Amino acid sequence: KVKASDVKNIFLEDGDVLECEAVREALDTGSEFNSRTSAHAFATTLLEFIGNLATPIIPLTNELADIKEDHVTPELCTVIMEKIPPVNHNVFVYIIVYLKEILEKSAINNVTAFALAEVFSRVFTYTNTYEPIEGTGNDTGNGNKKNTFVASSEVQLRPKNQKMMEINGQENMRRVMLIYLSDDYKG
């Protein structure tokens, strides 16, 4: 049986759409996975799962977005991680450990730290492209907001400065991930 860490371009190539659907179905129903499902389908499903969480693993903040390129240091990485909720921190650490295992086999799987940091920085810090407009029926009447997707007619684009914050935050998160994925990092 082939391990995912031995699969060429794992996390860098999308899995087959039908296989990904079957993986999601098995996860939803608790049924067994098809033994012939590709590692790429599992990897794609994991990325989609992380990217569709109700809140991102690493919340995009002005602080993360405003870091200057040469100021991303191991010490700063520790400060950033101390500010996220413990559950998010644990998920981040578990995935970093797994990605380091994949990098140990880079001669076999063709995967680089830069490529993994690029992919995972986007799913760790994703933001919704649209936000609900106030008063569009999301209020349940008792002050609580419903957790529902908003129809496209009820959304507005985020301001340009918000988009720039997202781009800068994701770029800085990529730099943070490169530090965590490096052989030198002992945090």
Locate each region found by the language model:
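Alpha-helical catalytic/interaction cores of small GTPase-regulatory modules
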Residues: K1-G187
